[in-house]
A protein has these predicted regions:
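Conserved HGGG/HGGXW glycine-rich cap/lid loop of the alpha/beta-hydrolase fold
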Residues: 1-35
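Short alpha-helix in the alpha/beta-hydrolase fold that links the catalytic acid
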Residues: 18, 171-180
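Gly/Ala-rich beta-loop-alpha elbow adjacent to hydrolase catalytic centers
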Residues: 51-55, 59
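Flexible "cap/lid" loop of the alpha/beta hydrolase fold
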Residues: 64-65, 70-101
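Conserved alpha/beta-hydrolase catalytic His-Asp/Glu region
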Residues: 101-153
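Short beta-strand/loop motif that positions the catalytic acidic residue
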Residues: 155, 161-163, 167
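Acidic catalytic loop of the alpha/beta-hydrolase fold
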Residues: 166-170, 195
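Catalytic histidine-centered segment of alpha/beta-hydrolase-like enzymes
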Residues: 193-206
Length: 217
């Protein structure tokens, strides 16, 4: 079974280096924005998706678009809605601006992932692509579509959801919403504030992928 990884905003493939599960391809956030991943998936008969952060948002989109093809879904710090509103715990525009600045700073040696020897999950991209990604995150709201999807029968495949309890980018309450959308999902809340969970719990993500019924087919 082919496993496709949908990466997060401003992130390089190195963020997945500690995960050992075999993957067919890691799609960058730019490839998500450009429709490359959608085109590839449309030509596959079946697949497993692993989506992190912005890639998790796209994984939710593709779950609704290709429900019969999708044979397993792993959501890592994923959210249907990144921004805060009256009834939703999310980021403020000011926090998003700080995230952009922090991402640029994190690319240097001071980033804790580099100092500790773990993969650095962030890589600098062009200003144009960074802005495109942020525009997507600011505008996207999949909550109503997901609620309608769940009401119509939802997914039949296994779903795993991993979320840090104190993540400052994707709030823990987001996982509760996703758990309601996918009532049979395995939801695991992780202690701490790490957003790039693939460098903290790679073995749990590996186990989730390998637990998919058709993983070895």
């Amino acid at each position: 079974m082919k496993v496709f990884v949908l990466n997060g905003w401003a992130s390089g493939p190195e963020v997945w280096d500690l995960c050992r599960f075999p993957r067919e391809r890691i799609f960058s956030y730019v490839e998500l924005l450009d429709g490359v991943a959608e085109d590839v998936l449309s030509r596959e008969d079946e697949f497993i998706l692993v989506g992190w952060s912005m890639g998790g948002s796209y994984a939710l989109r593709y779950a609704m678009q290709f429900p019969e093809k999708l044979k397993g879904l792993v959501l890592v710090a994923a959210t249907p809605r990144m921004m805060r509103d009256e009834n939703w715990a999310g980021m403020t525009p000011r926090r998003v601006a700080a995230l952009e600045l922090g991402t640029k700073m994190a690319n240097g040696a001071s980033f804790m992932g580099s100092v500790s020897g773990r993969p650095n999950p962030y890589s600098i991209d062009s200003d144009k692509n960074l802005s495109r990604g942020l525009d997507y995150l600011k505008a996207t709201d999949l909550r109503r579509d997901l609620a309608d999807f769940a009401a119509s029968g939802g997914l039949k495949c296994p779903v795993y959801i991993f979320q840090s309890l104190a993540d400052g980018i994707v709030r823990a309450d987001n996982a509760k919403f996703l758990g309601a959308v996918f009532p049979n999902a395995h939801v695991e809340m992780i202690e701490g504030s790490e957003h790039a969970l693939s460098i903290v719990i790679p073995e749990k993500i590996d186990a989730a992928v390998e637990a998919m019924p058709n993983f070895l087919v």
